[in-house]
């Protein structure tokens, strides 16, 4: 798998030699792994670029979360919001009281003030909205999954690829979080040893059903419960964890086997399984075991990456490393605090600025993890959109209309972009997740074909 955001190859020696003191400390057994620098919280910090005029389409629970997060980011200026359901539109206005409110998405796209559009509707509606927004010359942030079919996702990705003046970002938020980038560097450096296997889960005891006094409206808002409109648990939720594993391993899966059952929520005529398991096969014999359920909440969600020298557990953007007894010693144990993890004892990072100068003044081990992935993702999108818009404006003022030259110029500009999931990453994630869902529904094994990932 060729990853455009791939880091330079790092040897174990290079990684250890170039790491900060806090990073070296984090490589001890059972250590919370933290990003090397404490980020400035976007809500309280200075804008990293000029404000971008934003329009949000889709004001359900997640759309309102995006809206609320944007309202705290200095780079965002919310000028338009849209939802076809009046009560949702009114709730959205609480976070954006000055924004133009409409029930017609075309009004948002025709609004010349709007520079960037956020698509937060159900996935089966994404294609029409995202493609139209790109054709209107807008920057587009489209939630994950890109679509509920591979055909629709491919159409969106192809439109994004063709719209070279626009920034397109898929809502795989973890790809923008600095903690994840630290783990990416750590795993690819070989410090974990040889990758052996991975495990991930998402458990929530909830029905996924929303109530409404209107029967038609109730059917509309419960799109997750019908196979016609739902990508299932693995496509709606699991896509983020599957993408993380694929990203960290820098390999697409070779095959997937799945199983799914409707066990708990059997009385409302849904046909989407509430409990699923999937095994994804990667090169070199590495397997990811994934499970998700709406019937039990125990242990919530996490990922574990197993290597020949250590295992890494990731929860809530925090991570801990558990070393094998025969793993190489790093020599910093004297500075570390020991924590208990059930029957195991790990060595914890001491958050002490007097000893760990790399933590920075007032820094803590949780400083990066305290900011959610959505904030980092939206800030990356806005920063990249502002940078590209400025580059286009400056180029045209100096060189006029020359699309080929402009395309080359923007390719250089994008080399310094903030980390985020683009159209290819978003499309690849959809192919993996939707094929996994197909395997789950059919209780079968599916081999991935190279051409499924091709955008032409």
Which sequence ranges carry the predicted segments?
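Predominantly a Rossmann-like dinucleotide-binding segment in NAD(P)-dependent oxidoreductases
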Residues: 58-62, 162-169, 173-270, 300-304, ...
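Active-site beta-strand termini and strand-to-loop segments that position acidic
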Residues: 279-284, 307
């Amino acid at each position: 798998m060729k990853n455009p955001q791939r880091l330079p190859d790092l040897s174990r020696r290079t990684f250890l030699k170039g790491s900060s003191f806090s990073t070296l400390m984090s490589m001890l057994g059972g250590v919370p792994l933290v990003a090397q620098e404490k980020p400035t919280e976007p809500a309280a910090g200075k804008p990293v670029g000029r404000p971008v005029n934003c329009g949000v389409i889709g004001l359900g629970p997640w759309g309102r979360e995006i809206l609320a997060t944007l309202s705290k980011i200095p780079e965002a200026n919310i000028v338009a919001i849209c939802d076809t359901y009046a009560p949702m539109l009114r709730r959205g206005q609480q976070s954006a009281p000055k924004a133009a409110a409409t029930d017609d998405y075309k009004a948002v796209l025709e609004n010349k003030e709007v520079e960037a559009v956020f698509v937060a509707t159900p996935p089966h509606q994404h294609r029409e909205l995202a493609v139209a927004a790109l054709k209107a010359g807008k920057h587009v942030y489209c939630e994950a999954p890109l679509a509920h079919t591979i055909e629709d996702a491919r159409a969106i990705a192809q439109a994004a690829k063709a719209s070279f003046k626009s920034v397109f970002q898929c809502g795989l938020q973890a790809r923008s979080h600095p903690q994840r980038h630290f783990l990416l560097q750590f795993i690819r450096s070989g410090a974990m040893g040889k990758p052996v296997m991975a495990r991930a889960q998402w458990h929530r005891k909830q029905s996924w059903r929303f109530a409404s006094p209107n029967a038609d409206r109730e059917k509309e808002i419960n799109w997750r419960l019908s196979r016609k409109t739902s990508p299932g648990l693995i496509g709606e939720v699991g896509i983020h964890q599957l993408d993380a594993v694929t990203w960290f391993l820098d390999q697409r899966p070779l095959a997937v086997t799945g199983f799914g059952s409707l066990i708990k929520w059997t009385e409302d005529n849904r046909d989407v399984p509430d409990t699923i398991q999937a095994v994804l096969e990667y090169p070199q014999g590495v397997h990811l075991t994934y499970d998700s359920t709406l019937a039990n909440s125990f242990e919530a969600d996490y990922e574990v990456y197993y290597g020949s020298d250590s295992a890494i557990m990731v929860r809530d953007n925090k991570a801990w490393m558990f070393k094998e007894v025969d793993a190489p010693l790093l020599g910093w144990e004297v500075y570390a605090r020991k924590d208990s993890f059930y029957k195991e004892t790990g060595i914890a990072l001491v958050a002490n600025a007097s000893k760990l100068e790399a933590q920075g003044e007032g820094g803590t081990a949780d400083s990066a993890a305290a900011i959610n992935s959505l904030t980092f993702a939206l800030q990356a999108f806005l920063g990249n959109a502002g940078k590209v818009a400025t580059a286009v404006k400056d180029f045209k003022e100096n060189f006029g209309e020359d699309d080929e030259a402009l395309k080359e110029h923007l390719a250089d500009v994008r080399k310094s972009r903030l980390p985020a999931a683009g159209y290819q990453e978003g499309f690849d994630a959809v192919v993996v997740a939707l094929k996994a869902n197909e395997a789950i529904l059919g209780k079968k094994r599916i081999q991935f074909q190279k051409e499924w990932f091709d955008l032409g």
